[in-house]
C-alpha cells in the first residue's frame, strides 16, 4: 500500500434511476433511497483508494455514519464527494457529502474503510 494523503478527495456524479428509489411508500414515491446513497458513498471512497493499493490488496467498508437529510426525486443527478480525514495504518476515514443537481445537500457523515490482503481475507472467511 502506498501512502494515502489526508485531504485526498474524489467526486462521482450519478444520474438516479428507478432502481435507486424507495419502494415501501408505494406508487408515486420516486425518491433516491438511503441504501443507494450509501452504495454510492462506498463506491466513491473505494475509487479514490485504488491508485494507492498494491497488487493483491483491496479496501472494504467497515463503518458508515450518514444522515440522509433531504429527498431527491428519481431522475435528478446526485454528486457524492469523499475526502480522506484520517489515515491510521490500514484504516482510512472519509468525510462524505452528497448534493443533488440543484445544489441542495442531501447527505453527510463519515465512512471508514480498511485496506486488506485479498487472499488472507478470503482464507479467513472461507469456513464461515
Language model segments and positions:
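Generic structural detector for well-ordered beta-strands
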Residues: 11-17, 67, 110-114
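Short, residue-level hotspots on alpha-helical faces of the histone-fold
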Residues: 39-43, 47
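Short, charged, low-complexity patches
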Residues: 34-38
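HotDog/MaoC-like acyl-thioester-processing domains
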Residues: 73-74, 84-128
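A generic structural signal for short beta-strands and their flanking turns/coil linkers
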Residues: 8-10, 60-64, 76-80, 90-92, ...
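Catalytic strand-loop segment that frames the active site of acyl-thioester-processing enzymes
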Residues: 1-33
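Hydrophobic beta-strand-centered segment that forms part of the acyl-chain substrate-binding groove
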Residues: 46-79
Amino acid at each position: 500500500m502506498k501512502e494515502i494523503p489526508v485531504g485526498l478527495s474524489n467526486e462521482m456524479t450519478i444520474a438516479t434511476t428507478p432502481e435507486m428509489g424507495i419502494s415501501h411508500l408505494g406508487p408515486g414515491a420516486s425518491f433516491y433511497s438511503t441504501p443507494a446513497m450509501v452504495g454510492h458513498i462506498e463506491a466513491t471512497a473505494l475509487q479514490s483508494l485504488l491508485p494507492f493499493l498494491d497488487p493483491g490488496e483491496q479496501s472494504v467498508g467497515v463503518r458508515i455514519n450518514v444522515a440522509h437529510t433531504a429527498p431527491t426525486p428519481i431522475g435528478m443527478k446526485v454528486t457524492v464527494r469523499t475526502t480522506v480525514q484520517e489515515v491510521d495504518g490500514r484504516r482510512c476515514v472519509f468525510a462524505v457529502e452528497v448534493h443533488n443537481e440543484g445544489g441542495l445537500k442531501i447527505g453527510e457523515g463519515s465512512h471508514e474503510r480498511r485496506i486488506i490482503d485479498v487472499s488472507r481475507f478470503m482464507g479467513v472467511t472461507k469456513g464461515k
